[in-house]
Amino acid sequence: MSNQINFTFQDSDWVPPTNYPDLRNAKEIAIDLETKDPEIKIKGPGWPTNNGNVIGIAVATDTFKGYFPVAHEAGGNMDMMMTLKWVQDICRSKATKIFHNASYDIGWLRANGIVVYGDVADTMIAAALIDENRRMYSLNALSVDFISELKSEAGLKEAAQDWGIDAKAEMFKLPAKFVGPYAEQD
């Protein structure tokens, strides 16, 4: 009888961007943060109390999309300081910055010394202004209703199951290669 346990983990072909593109001339820049926020459901966002951290930053324009992992516990990260400097340059640009639940992401950006300048568009607030009686304001629900697209979480959930973790609450424990495809969809 063998005591050996065999594991078969899902693999991913995703790799992070190889450079930091100059996006300062874009008209609109969408930004979404992936975070480790362990007590968000109990105490609210961790950025005001320094409880948690940013694990990656997804950025998209009309010609570019990329996920920049910076603090995944299982690796695959880019240089944190270089990435934050690049994001600061983007946030200083004249482009409209687009977020979903902007107060959360901007709070984490500010906790990392990044100030967002210029116009900010929040898709969650916009959705409430369009239809205050919606049942759900999640990005997935809005995507289905307004652009007929559904974000695929299958790869993320499968990897999380392989690693024995919660796909959303413990995303920070996964290697970046499993989070990248998910994060770039936002």
Model-derived regions: residue spans:
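Long, highly charged low-complexity segments
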Residues: 1-50, 80-91
